[in-house]
Amino acid sequence: MAQSFTGKKRIRKSFGRIPEAVQMPNLIEVQRSSYEQFLQREVRAGERRDEGIEAVFKSVFPIKDFNERAVLEYVSYEFEEPKYDVEECVQRDMTYAAPLKVKLRLIVFETDEETGARSVKDIKEQDVYMGDIPLMTEKGTFIVNGTQRVIVSQMHRSPGVFFDHDKGKTHASGKLLFAARVIPYRGSWLDFEFDAKDIVYVRIDRRRKLPATTFLMALGMDGEEILSTFYETVPYEKKGDGWATPYKPERWRGVKPEFPLIDADTGEEIAPAGQKISARNAKKFADNGLKTLLLAPEALTGRYLAKDLVNFETGEIYAEAGDELDPTLLAALEEQGFTTLDVLDIDEVTVGAYIRNTLRVDKNTAREDALFDIYRVMRPGEPPTVEAAEAMFKSLFFDSERYDLSSVGRVKMNMRLELDCPDDVRVIRKEDVIAVLLTLVGLRDGRGEIDDIDNLGNRRVRSVGELLENQYRVGLLRMERAIKERMSSVDIDTVMPHDLINAKPAAAAVREFFGSSQLSQFMDQTNPLSEITHKRRLSALGPGGLTRERAGFEVRDVHPTHYGRICPIETPEGPNIGLINSLATHAVVNKYGFIESPYRRIRDGKTTDEVVYMSAMEEAKHVIAQANIKLENGEIVEDLVPGRINGEPSLLPKADVDLMDVSPKQVVSVAASLIPFLENDDANRALMGSNMQKQAVPLIQSDAPLVGTGMESIVAVDSGAVVVARRTGVVEQIDGTRIVVRATEETDPSKPGVDIYRLQKFQRSNTSTCINQRPLVRVGDKINAGDVIADGPSTELGELALGRNALVAFMPWNGYNFEDSILISERIVRDDVFTSIHIEEFEVMARDTKLGPEEITRDIPNVGEEALRNLDEAGIVAIGAEVQPGDILVGKVTPKGESPMTPEEKLLRAIFGEKASDVRDTSLRLPPGVSGTIVEVRVFNRHGVDKDERALAIERAEIDRLGKDRDDEFAILNRNMQGRLRQLLVGKTAVSGPKGLGRGEITAEKLEEIAPGLWWQIALDDEKAMGELEALRKQFDDARKRLDRRFEDKVDKLQRGDELPPGVMKMVKVFVAVKRKLQPGDKMAGRHGNKGVISKILPIEDMPYLEDGTSVDIVLNPLGVPSRMNVGQIFETHLGWAAAGLGKQVQRLLEDWQHGGQKQALIEHLRDVYGPDEELPDTEEELVELARNLSKGIPFATPVFDGAHIDDIENLLEKAGLDRSGQSYLYDGQSGERFKRPVTVGYIYMLKLHHLVDDKIHARSIGPYSLVTQQPLGGKAQFGGQRFGEMEVWALEAYGAAYTLQEMLTVKSDDVAGRTKVYESIVRGDDTFEAGIPESFNVLVKEMRSLGLNVELENS
């Protein structure tokens, strides 16, 4: 396989033995494809599928006015270009969105007064603006008000029908009560349920229950039809003293008759009473010619009539359908001359009389009564009329505007009920209700299985597109009402469509969804992995989902159908466990919203290249083998292979297997697949490991892991953190902020022949970490499309690099690694191994107040020159200034109202004759706990406000940058064009041309003598060539105009002024970069859930050291491994140790070669490590670069569940010249003595987590107080104090520390007068104070007074 540009520079040796059968899908495809389906932005208007926005418009339109004089129809929609690009939106705090224009057609009718016929009077079409729709960036995020947001996909119960029982919890007897529920996509829920007496009830929207037969009657069935639908009919004919009935063997299997069975034809006894009839005997009777049975009259007792028995002449009803036969009734019927009876086939064993009993309980007999009953339940208190009841019932389940099963619901319903109904029938039909009841009754009779609601076949994913579609529909429906009212109130003949439409409700619905929906989340931007996992998250919470409190254990648990779809490992710890999940690496979401997992087809024990994606429902029918089964030339070797059938793992014969997994890592999520030796870790720790990788802070210098899994490069590219080449080309120009690439493949004439990649420099992420991209290419490098050309945060050479490789020893050290503490070497701090940069953003606004405008200025009252040293003449801090807590970042003064003057102020006023104090200082100062360097300042001015010097300087710099981009692009375009012109002109015959070029053949030498700008003037005798010349010229002019237009647009936007909140004249944002070195109290972790807090930083000379004098970097506690069962970290240590040993050998061989040795020795060593199949670089320059990169350690990939074995690690340790045990003798840095036994030493990949002590530690002197209780606030954010609670008071009481207790409860807390006096006395240098009454006592007194109890304090 050809290696990528970065792949050549550092080759990762993989231990994977199982080839990948299918390429992993793009990791943020879920988000992108869903939103693309919603917008259908690239699809032409007439060709759009009926989904997304198109479906919403088609469902809401056409809109008719109340008297149907006019109708507003939807034609099509289109998006205009967004006003600002992504970068501009982030800087200006705008939403990245495109205006939506909808073409509507208003048709006005006129009615002929005589005939009443309608004819079209007028048709008007118009494009109407319908608000802005946010666009998704290439990274799968949205920019809303300048911040990156992610819409998390929601897991919810699929629409369809579900059968369940109460697990015996409802009734004291523990009897199972079955229930069926029809869940639509939108509309009323329909429940059918049994009660303890086996009567079937129906509930609509969980309201009061009614007998199920009431619902059937409302559907237009009568009692007789209901019974004939649910029960078979058995005919009985009077014969002598008994009743004859046809013999059916299946009815008598396993039955013990209470009376003898007699053959009606022969009169002989077939079977005696009380003897059980076996299935074999039942069949034998039929084979022997038994056709009709003669039963005693008692056999009919307890049976139910199937039809009404009526005397048609007199109209007298003798018995109704469903009546129970008893000897009296039977005798009466015989007397009336009934010789044949149709009886329901209910034997109370295999068929129960539940529907018949329900019909008996039901008071209603006619459809009208049933409709009234349903109306009373749905609208209690309203008197029902036939029309209202009919309309209400129809709108509940049979009106497509109110009720929608969705195509998913219909498909699920068809599958479960074995119906065959097209999936565009999205309302309930009578047949569906009957099928649901038949299935439910079958369950009660012991036939069939209940559904498992946690099966992924019954849960589906709603992604961005669908969530926004539902929200937009809500907005349009709100708008629909307003349109109808307006159509009726205006003169319909004169209005245009835009007069009828107010797009505010639709735009507000979209804004509300992105701004405040539970599923619209602030993107976790700590590092590239946290971004990617946030976009792949599946949440069961949110609108229409579960709540934390209601979700039980079953919903949260891992289900067999999660295999290959949802990761069983990655989920948060805490109340959300199991409710928030992550998509597995290879999983995709299908068009119905079900998660599918890929499998390879197996035919006759042989694997094929065919890969099929299956949902949980489809998979249930197949026998699936694991990915690690032994294969030889594609054929399964063993007769019994490990696999699963119906989710249950078992050993299966190879002949039965028809599918196999595509990869061992298809089970886990992206984060879990980044943990090497995951298979050797306990699941709880693996969970912590996956979650903590997402909290790793990007470091100044990252290392890719020596021991990786091969997923690192995929994550880096798919997350969008690195810059990937769009087209093949050559690097023309490069600096820290951009890369200019000239495309070399034949480019489309309409596209520029140059790509400019702007790099992000020191940008602030959502979590205040630093986003900084660094180029990896040099001028002249040839790159291919898809190559990584620049690294981003937490990446190195195009691979994810969340932390650093550190030399670790597992041993106790003077108690400093007690309870998972970590001891680190001073070298780590000195060399900035774990130093990170954090960028804090501060903003200040100058508003227009009632007393006058606030002003951003350097002229601040009562502030010395020292405090203003970093400010420029506009009062804004300079870039590069070092700032400390309390320093002024932006000087600002606010007008203050006239207050009485002190004598001193009056004197000043008299002397200087001007207002000395009409403004107060409201400058933006750096808060406590932050110090750093100013890296960026942005100034925003309201349109029409004069810009200060600083704003103009920033604007000039930005215009220069844009101009440079334009000029560079033009220069390359010019060079390209000259090359193409030269090719076209050389060898042709000139007819005329500029001065210096004679007629005749054009040669390269002649062309060189003429300025390239004049080549266009050459006229050729060849018409075809002349046509090409003209086409080139037009193309060149168009490209130049396009560049100029783009430049002018951007400059215009810069100079136009900014859209600021109301009342704000000017806004300044200041970005401060804070350098955070590692210090005691910071949290660190490995990738195996092995986390700890730094306890001490030890001088290098005191750290334990190896025999060659190398000090270890980190000392971890060995007791942290056995009980936690995350042995993966030990394997990683050994393999990392081998990697570093082999790297040293590469370095030695490289040095030998560079000092006159043999190149071959180095190549042979690399071949020995990588194996003969690995492709090594061709050129010496590339080989040297590779060897240099490998000298720190040879990187390995051990894919999850398919990684390195112990013997692999031991062999590599041996190759590296190290002990096969992976242990080494260490020496005590303090005494120089060797420790008694060898210690496990090696390289572990350590992460610094986003739990930094600087962000947590906090101290308060004087700060804000609570308004009512006057006690100090709590928490760092409020600059609060430490609470001295009840238990602490007991402690002081126990010590008898009365005075300390008194000051804690009064002057240090809520004694307002007392604390002011303390402050004054401290200022005076005095330390006496008096405690008064705490405010909380006054609050208590007031509370008592509010209850009518007067409390007065008496002086004693």
From Swiss-Prot:
Its EC number is 2.7.7.6. Gene3D superfamilies: 2.40.50.100, 2.40.50.150, 3.90.1100.10, 6.10.140.1670, DNA-directed RNA polymerase, beta subunit, external 1 domain, DNA-directed RNA polymerase, subunit 2, domain 6, RNA polymerase alpha subunit dimerisation domain, RNA polymerase Rpb2, domain 2. One of its GO terms (cellular component) is DNA-directed RNA polymerase complex. SUPFAM superfamilies: beta and beta-prime subunits of DNA dependent RNA-polymerase (SSF64484). It catalyses: RNA(n) + a ribonucleoside 5'-triphosphate = RNA(n+1) + diphosphate. GO terms for biological process: DNA-templated transcription. It is an enzyme of class 2 (transferase). One of its GO terms (molecular function) is ribonucleoside binding. The keyword Membrane does not apply. Keywords: DNA-directed RNA polymerase, Nucleotidyltransferase, Transcription, Transferase. The keyword Transit peptide does not apply. HAMAP family: RNApol_bact_RpoB. DNA-dependent RNA polymerase catalyzes the transcription of DNA into RNA using the four ribonucleoside triphosphates as substrates. The RNAP catalytic core consists of 2 alpha, 1 beta, 1 beta' and 1 omega subunit. When a sigma factor is associated with the core the holoenzyme is formed, which can initiate transcription. Belongs to the RNA polymerase beta chain family. This is DNA-directed RNA polymerase subunit beta.
